[in-house]
Amino acid sequence: GPSAPRRVFISNAMLPMASEVHTLLVPIYGDSSGLSASRIGLILGSFATATFMVRLLTPWISRRLNEHQVLTVALFIAGAVYLAFPFLRNAGTLMFLSFVLGIGLGAGQPMVMAILHTHAPPGRMGEAAGVRMSLVNSMAVAVPLLFGVVGGTFGLAPVLWSVGVCLTTGGWLTRRANAGPSP
């Protein structure tokens, strides 16, 4: 399988992707669901609130779970939210899902940096951080373009489900990699 730094880079690409898709598609999805702009803003705000709150709890969380466990849970939470999103249209429910997504992504992103720091070859942390930033910035450009085309062609549900499957698969791979080699 992929080396530890490569797995970290893959996970690192998934988390910003999930955040970008949320920011891009919630307004479109909310509008197509008949929600007002203020309700859509509340949905986006619930995501930001959860992200902020969980970041305040990061020291407490990291004393109880290791980075790989937090990242695994974050990917599974985010994947489950994206898989459920297309089935729901109520503003309150979407606010709740966005809040849960904010918890997952907010907890996972700092752990990626901790894992990257742990697995970067000695003396190459700057290089690893540079590759990470290049990847994150590339995702910020590519994801809206790609999913905009897919969503415009096939609708929003396949985009949301695809993101959910990617994140859930990432959680499974992260959990499997953290479990070590099979006997």
Each PLM stretch: what is its role?
Residues 42-51, 136:
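Transmembrane alpha-helical segments of major facilitator superfamily
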Residues 4-11, 15-33:
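Helix-loop boundary and gating motifs at the non-cytosolic
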Residues 37-38, 122-132:
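Loop-to-transmembrane helix entry/capping segments in MFS-fold secondary transporters
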Residues 54-66, 151-152:
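Helix-to-loop junctions at the C-terminal end of transmembrane segments
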Residues 81, 92-100:
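Paired small-residue
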Residues 107-120:
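Intracellular juxtamembrane helix-capping segments at the cytosolic ends
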Residues 149-166:
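A membrane-interface helix-boundary motif in multi-pass transporters
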Residues 69-84:
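Structural signature of the two symmetry-related core transmembrane helices
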